[in-house]
């Protein structure tokens, strides 16, 4: 090994140690299972969970015996015992689409809430792009609309409305997310094995609501664990489009719906091929019927909003007519 190669190796080792220390400093505050299962944390998590559902009999019963419930949960979690009580499965019509909901019992829900609020969310959202707006505190549909309008304005100042926006849709997004990939991502973010184990237990519980052939895949709607996992599942694809795909001029995501602005039709076709390959790599599937490239000087629909970019640069965003008909 030459002297130059030795210097490069030492420089790389110093860089790795520096990144490791920075990561430990950022994550260290949340990398502690006691922060998640402490009675005070569980107490706060319960009161956050009961908002909007305090009228339910199960919630009132848990509230009436709250100290006893929290004491039992803390003891079980400290001894690494399971606290799972299965799912309540039902259907719900949301934005004109019938969805299968798998809701957890309130006594398990507040533990999941504590895990998400005191560990997963503060750490995982560090790597989430600003344009990824679903299920993140302070984000939401309004910010997603603002991000899209800002990207369109920035593109218009350079190229006018002569371009394309590629609208992606993931096929059966929550039903196809591989558990192995998400668990590996969480294991890379945390050092505490108990946090990883608890998250793995919650993820493994979804196997009980899926057929045998789908074991190890899919999440259930109605769980906060599902929401943070859904946000993380396609995060590598978003980073690729934002940081490596040089033909893009801005991208956004709201769970299974995402977009990227490109300059011409060839770049749009390439973007679809690239995202299709990346989805396959991470165990997801692109809905090729709903995925399409639309010229920016044509109206398009994203997140149930109809968007028009005028030749003058004026951007008009309204609720789509098809969305209104679904609610009639």
Model regions and ranges:
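Non-catalytic, polymerase-adjacent accessory regions of viral genome-replication enzymes
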Residues: 1-71
């Amino acid at each position: 090994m030459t002297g130059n190669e030795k210097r490069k190796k030492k420089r790389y080792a110093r860089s790795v140690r520096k990144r490791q220390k920075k990561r430990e400093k950022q994550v260290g505050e949340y990398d502690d299972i006691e922060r998640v299962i402490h009675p005070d944390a569980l107490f706060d998590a319960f009161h956050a969970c009961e908002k909007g559902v305090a009228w339910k009999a199960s919630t009132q019963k848990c509230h009436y015996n709250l100290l006893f419930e929290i004491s039992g949960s803390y003891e079980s979690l400290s001894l690494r015992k399971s606290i799972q009580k299965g799912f309540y499965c039902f259907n719900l019509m949301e934005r004109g689409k019938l969805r299968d909901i798998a809701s957890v019992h309130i006594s398990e829900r507040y533990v999941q809430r504590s895990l998400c609020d005191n560990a997963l969310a503060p750490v995982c959202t560090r790597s989430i792009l600003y344009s990824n707006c679903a299920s993140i505190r302070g984000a939401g549909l309004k910010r997603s609309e603002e991000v899209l309008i800002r990207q369109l304005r920035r593109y218009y100042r350079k190229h006018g409305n002569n371009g394309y926006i590629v609208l992606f849709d993931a096929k059966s997004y929550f039903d196809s997310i591989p558990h192995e990939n998400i668990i590996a991502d969480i294991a890379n973010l945390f050092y505490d094995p108990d946090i990883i184990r608890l998250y793995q237990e919650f993820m493994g519980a979804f196997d009980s609501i899926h057929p045998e052939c789908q074991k190890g895949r899919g999440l259930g709607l109605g769980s906060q664990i599902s929401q943070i996992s859904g946000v993380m599942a396609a995060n590598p694809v978003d980073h690729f489009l934002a940081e490596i795909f040089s033909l893009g001029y801005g991208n956004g995501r709201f769970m299974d719906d995402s977009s990227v602005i490109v300059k011409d039709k060839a770049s749009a076709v390439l973007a679809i091929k690239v995202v299709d390959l990346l989805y396959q790599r991470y165990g997801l599937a692109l809905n090729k019927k709903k995925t399409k490239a639309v010229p920016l000087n044509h109206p398009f629909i994203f997140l149930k909003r109809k968007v028009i970019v005028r030749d003058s640069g004026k951007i008009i965003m309204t609720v789509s007519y098809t969305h209104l008909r679904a609610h009639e």
